[in-house]
Regions:
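Classic N-terminal secretory signal peptides
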Residues: 2-22
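N-terminal alpha-helical segment
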Residues: 6, 47-49, 77
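Electrostatic cytochrome c docking/interface patches
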Residues: 16-32, 44, 52, 104-107
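Gly/Gly-Pro-rich "capping" loops immediately C-terminal to redox-active cysteine motifs
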Residues: 29, 40-72, 82
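The canonical Cys-X-X-Cys-His
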Residues: 33-41, 96
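C-terminal capping alpha-helices of c-type cytochrome domains
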Residues: 73-76, 84-107
Length: 107
């Protein structure tokens, strides 16, 4: 194989990898306790600022990843969510999203 062939093979392989690591829902389950403290309580509202906390069970996996990354980067503003999101690695965010997306939506 020539250097060019090796390089092109490597570049092609990288181009086809996912932007996010595949999430492991079992690992996500062990991390989700921190989410259910707010997102698992019916009619829960934050003390400050005061607004309804949404239920997230069954939410789209890609949306959860996007939202948590946005909180971590400060693109979405909420002190609690920003701190929570920053505490997770990219893999842990993917794991959480994989787990939460498989849960039944709250009624």
């Amino acid at each position: 194989m020539t250097k060019t062939t090796i390089f092109l093979s490597f570049a092609f392989a990288l181009a086809n990898t996912s932007a996010y690591a595949a999430g492991d829902s079992q690992k996500g389950k062990s991390l989700a306790y921190t989410c259910t403290g707010c997102h698992g309580i019916n009619q829960y509202k934050n003390a400050y600022p005061s607004y309804h906390v949404p239920k997230i069970g069954g939410q789209n996996e890609a949306y959860i990843i996007s939202a948590l990354n946005a909180y971590a980067k400060g693109e979405r503003n909420h002190p609690t969510m920003g701190a929570q999101a920053k505490s997770f690695s990219s893999q842990e965010i993917a794991d959480l999203a994989a787990y939460i997306s498989t849960q039944k939506p709250a009624h």
